[in-house]
Amino acid sequence: QGNGLVPGLLTLNFRTAPDLFVWGNAGVPLKIRYRYPAGTWINFSESRLDVSINNSYLRSLPLTKTGMVQQVKDIISPDFVMNEQTVRVPPYYVFGQNQLQFYYDLRPVKVGECQDVLPNNIQESIDPDSTIDLSKTERFASLPNLAFFVNSGYPFTRMADLSDTAIVLPDQLTSQDIETYLDLMGMMGDSTGFPVVRSTVVTANSVDQVSGKDLIVLGSIANQPLITKWADNSKLRVEGGHLRVGMTSPLDRVYTVLDPNAAQERDRVDNLLVSQGDNLAAMIGLQSPLNSSHSAVIITGSSPDKLLTVINAFRNRELNPSIQGDLMIAGAGRVTSFRIGNEYSVGYLPALTKLRWWLGNSPLILILFTLIGVLIVALVAYWLLRRLAMGRLQSRSAP
């Protein structure tokens, strides 16, 4: 609720997992019931209610003399108008932690210089019956996506208590490892609004016991053996105690031919990793090497204190939006993100929708299917025309 002609920003915070999926441009329906003053003093044609989410503008709603919810208006007071509008929210505007923002801009009727007469108590509000309906969305996402992880802890926070998550710590713990672990669990709890009470903590030697869980691996390159063991799964490798881009496979070489920029991007990533030397602080997202239906995130560095550099990048509001893809390198007050590995999907889509999504994300396959379809149509047309031609010839040659 606000007061005055321009009451300032009215906000509402809400949390959800960031894996919302809506096919096409349908969006998520946000039904807004909003109340504002009635009277001859207000210029309804110029007044409006601006609606945004997470600082992204959605739509301006009109303020009319009579509301669409007239029966509610009569019950409340004849001095107020209750209106209702539905705004479609694009799913890519919805994150883990969200804020709906409403900005009333009331304009009075201009009578003359210094002659405007305004009521003493001008109030506006958003009705508590307003809703945002997420029930028609699917839960589906392409991973790895470190932006999901740093903003909402996804996919680990799918279970608020992290009961489906295991944290893999080094055998030889340092104070920085423990601090990183505690900071990270605090951030997870802040994302869900629930304490992390059911996560599992293991060391690298026992990681096979938690193969059915999503994994967060902590430790420096030297202290955490899983980094060397699992680097290949993220198109990386450990060489001489340093992280490097992995050797190209035959399939990678085929993609390089189709996309000449791929080789340049690989070189750029490798050069940046080499330039970090003993100051590397990095985070890697990948499909769990132990179970293809689960995910893993590795927070590592050249030394244990570099893990805290990664955590500090999470907390920095200026750096946080730059964390994306499946590899993030932090240092010198900046972060650089890349996508170097393969994507995989989590969640569920109906079969037809998933096929459309897959084709939409695989343009080469779509072109191939189109060519095959054209070829089939051409062959069928040729066969039909040939039969018609043969039929005509036979009818002409008949006595």
Model regions and ranges:
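Solvent-exposed alpha-helical segments and adjacent loops
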Residues: Q1-P399
